[in-house]
């Protein structure tokens, strides 16, 4: 996923957090900020130290990014959102990560339902 699709700066993260619009399941918390007239969505990924060491956290981030890449055509373009991984995610396969991420994105109404379920 291109860097233009990422929320990178702390100020941008804080804007999304301060909106306080969130959804969660057992594996993820997602914070959402609507940004009308934005060309494409932007995502920030946060994986805390409770998940494991740096190698484990980076592996989890790669799984999340890969899942988002597969879902990118279904994600609404006019939003910024932050995906926060919860402990236990490091034990899941890529398919399970994608299923959990799809579930929480549907709860947050980020995914376009017209495309159907993959």
Swiss-Prot record:
GO molecular function: 3'-tRNA processing endoribonuclease activity; ribonuclease P activity; tRNA binding
UniProt keyword Nuclease present: yes
Broadest EC class assigned to this enzyme: hydrolase
Coiled-coil portions: none
Origin superkingdom: Bacteria
Enzyme Commission number(s): 3.1.26.5
GO terms (BP aspect): tRNA 5'-leader removal
GO cellular component: ribonuclease P complex
Pfam family, one: Ribonuclease_P
Keyword terms: Endonuclease, Hydrolase, Nuclease, RNA-binding, tRNA processing
PANTHER family, per database record: RIBONUCLEASE P PROTEIN COMPONENT
Subunit structure: Consists of a catalytic RNA component (M1 or rnpB) and a protein subunit.
Functional summary from the UniProt entry: RNaseP catalyzes the removal of the 5'-leader sequence from pre-tRNA to produce the mature 5'-terminus. It can also cleave other RNA substrates such as 4.5S RNA. The protein component plays an auxiliary but essential role in vivo by binding to the 5'-leader sequence and broadening the substrate specificity of the ribozyme.
Record's protein name: Ribonuclease P protein component
UniProt source species: Enterococcus faecalis (strain ATCC 700802 / V583)
